[in-house]
């Protein structure tokens, strides 16, 4: 398999060639040269996160307390954050293809003990370790491909290109995964549903790493200590990068909190887990269109302004709507759907961050992308951690208020994230 790890010519990031963006698909932000990569990300994410919408309710039914569940997911999130950060700087050490192959290996190495030993024995310490190892697979795989996109697509379509990435990511994690697992759970049970993820992951790796013949151009001449030191120093030297990490962390806290809170909160109002999974999948169909809409809008009016005006504002209002829709309307799937749809639209408005943040440091995109990915990964930790801290003293309602306030803050924190003078998408 040595040929699969060849990264092509060893050029510096600033000297790389980008695609000549021609044809209707390229103008839509989906260059055909990367099409198999997008398909691979969708399949890999579907398999690697197939349990995320129902794992909390499954563990609760096995007698685990809410605090134990959220702690396990917080540990998982910390590992995801660390690996997400490394996926940006690791390209200069190992190369993008090699990182994605390592991610595939981690998935299988972590999944086997989690499914066959930890879950059947209800072994909590082993569950934490094996689930964390399984969990690092999807950010390492997906965010390495996000680096690939940022490297190979020119600025005028970058907002749309990264929106396609988040569409592939979101369709796998929040639409196909929940719908497919909802059907599988009722027919073959939890363990076999988890095992079905193996097929999706294998197919995803095949599409993104074998059928995808594009060669990322990235210098692999750094030592790991040098690359990690550079990634840390960017956060020390650049205040904008620190702000960007905070905003990107807030981006997905609702998504990773809601999948813990809603399976516990909604049954009080007569909702079943199957209803929750169906509604959650449906509203994320809306997110597909919102992702592309705001990617296009960001390319037109500016990435920063799109995030400032629409992202945190809509997500904050939606968090409050999700809290009070069941209180006001009871067991009303329509009311819950409308509230969650507002959240899905707001989430799409965060999409231009994936074009904005790397462009804040055009001379060091690798380190900037590592900051972007760190924020993405920290969402996995921050969402469950907020639940751990807040749900006992404040309840579900108070926790949703905390999430709403953080979203409102994210819009304000984006205001200073102005591009350098040579930036084109302010």
Question: Where are each of the predicted segments found?
Answer:
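Residue-level signature of mid-helix packing/kink "hotspots" within the transmembrane helices
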Residues: 77-85, 174-175, 284-288, 292, ...
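C-terminal ends and interior cores of transmembrane alpha-helices
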Residues: 105-121, 313-329
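Cytoplasmic helix-loop-helix junction between adjacent transmembrane helices
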Residues: 130-168
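Juxtamembrane intracellular "pre-TM" segments in multi-pass secondary transporters
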Residues: 15-31, 213-245
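Cytoplasmic membrane-interface "Motif A"-like loop-to-helix N-cap segments
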Residues: 93-104, 300-313
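Helix-to-loop junctions at the C-terminal end of transmembrane segments
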Residues: 84-96, 185, 291-303, 391
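Helix-loop boundary and gating motifs at the non-cytosolic
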Residues: 28-77, 242-247, 251-269
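A late C-terminal transmembrane helix in Major Facilitator Superfamily
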Residues: 364-393
